[in-house]
Every structure is written in structure tokens, then in C-alpha cells.
């Protein structure tokens, strides 16, 4: 058995792109040995940068583009993509079974995951990843510089032997990451650059609540912004306040992101509070003051 991506020839031809920038194409695969009722045994999602652009699962057997790519004609032959994903599904689940057989656990509930893809910067290949995990633990990864599969789990030594049974398998894996994947990404970018390069400014909402002990907690919520990077902090009387660390930036379910910052102050502190936001979608930093009338 050969690695997942080497089972079928690449379906896309060469493409040329002259513009500069950094972009990535990443595939995420998940296989389940005993899926719960209604859940697919195998799922795949492809991402352009951080934006999902198609899903596939074993229940439907179809690769289906998501918004806005579902309205883009010519980007991909989705029937051929469905055939490719069905072939990858079969090989992926065979690998999961092989691992379970190694551990003599043919009936257990286990998860096998894969992530692979590439990045281009200024129209040149600038990075790649190809690795797998079993039950949430690193299993095996491909090092394209050696090139070789690197076992990260006892069972992975057996997988390495199969995936390196012929030298050509390793060379094709290297070629996929360095040549074929970037070519595919460049083609996709001819249809996707405007969407990936967009800037959606954040919508900002400030709320407050009384915490135990009667201190007041102010929250500055920013949402519906893209790209992901954003800076939030609280000011009072032109002084930056000590506040809890950013909780992070989270997907908003619509291709944008949300984040928030909180600060806790004693009830006697009545000076105005201002939330400062910096984001690529804003022409200048945004300052939003807490309004007592909007208290919730």
C-alpha cells in the first residue's frame, strides 16, 4: 500500500501565477474505526489558507465545494475530485486497520488523522507538511529533505516499510509536496485570490456585567473580521489597563473570526473605559467607549 496521495495521478495541469503573497493548500483527513450512528467513517476538508473550500465524507461519497466556491465555475471537476477522494478514503481506512491489527485491537474505537499540503510565497514553494496521528498522538511524518517517512509510534515502523517498499514511492511523495501541490494551489488561486485577499473589518460590541464581589467586568467583543490577526486592549484615562490575556481568536462559522478582551474593575471606578482595536480591515485604529446606556 502506498501513501494516500500517491494512489492516483494528479488531475490538474500546470498553472502560472505572477502575483506575490503567501498562500497555503492543506487537506485534513479523519477516519473512524467505529463511528457513532449517522457519523461518516471518513471525512476530508480542503483549505485555502484558513478557508475551507470543499468537504467530502464517506456517507455522501461526494466532494462538495462550500461558499463562495460553490458558485465558481471551472475551478475543479467535482466529479473527478469525488472519485479521487473515494480512492483516498479506501487507502486511508486500510492504514487505520493495519495500525489496529498491529496493536491486536480489531474491534476497538480508534481515530486516524492526516494533514498534508503546501505553501507558496511570492509564487515559489516555501513550505510543506505531511503527517498523521493515531488516537490524537503523532504517528508518522514525511521529511522531504531526506526524503523519508519518520516513524513516531511503534506501529509506524511497519507503515514506513510499506510506504517505502519501492524507492519511487518516496520520490513521488517529495514531488507532490514540492511540485504538484504548489501547482494545484496556483491553479486554485486564479479563482480564489480576491476572496483570500479580502479584508473584513471587525464589528465591535462592548458589554458589562457585575462579578461576584460586585466588581464590574467589561468585555470588548470583536467579530466578523478577516483576516485572523487582530489586536484588542482596554484604556482608561489614556492609560493602558492591565487585563487578562487574549482568549484567542476563534472561527465565527461564516469564514470570519471573533475575539474578545475583558477587564475587571472595582465599582467605585467611574472613569470612561475605551476599547482599542487594530485590524488590517480598518483604515486606522478604532476606539469604542463603554456607554452606560447600553449596559447589559
Swiss-Prot record:
Residues with the Pyrrolidone carboxylic acid modification: 18
GO CC, any one term:
extracellular space
The reply on keyword Signal is yes
Any Pfam family matching the protein: MHC_I
In this chain the Ig-like C1-type domain maps to 202-287
Q: Name one GO biological process term.
A: cellular response to magnesium ion
The disulfide bonds in this chain are 118-181, 220-275
The protein's recorded glycosylation sites are 123, 254
UniProt keyword list: Disulfide bond, Glycoprotein, Pyrrolidone carboxylic acid, Secreted, Signal
Q: What sections of the protein cross the membrane?
A: none
Primary location: secreted
Tell me which SMART domains the record gives. IGc1
The stretch of residues making up the signal peptide is 1-17
* Superkingdom of the source species: Eukaryota
Subcellular location per UniProt equals: Secreted
Expressing tissues:
Expressed in liver, but not in a wide number of tissues, including prostate, mammary gland, kidney, intestine, lung, pancreas, ovary, uterus, thyroid, placenta, spleen, brain and heart.
Which PANTHER family does the record cross-reference, listed alphabetically?
Answer: MHC CLASS I-RELATED (PTHR16675), ZINC-ALPHA-2-GLYCOPROTEIN (PTHR16675:SF289)
Quaternary structure and partners: Interacts with PIP.
Outline what the protein does: Stimulates lipid degradation in adipocytes and causes the extensive fat losses associated with some advanced cancers.
- Family of this protein: Belongs to the MHC class I family.
- Name-wise, this protein is Zinc-alpha-2-glycoprotein
Q: Which organism is it from?
A: Rattus norvegicus (Rat)
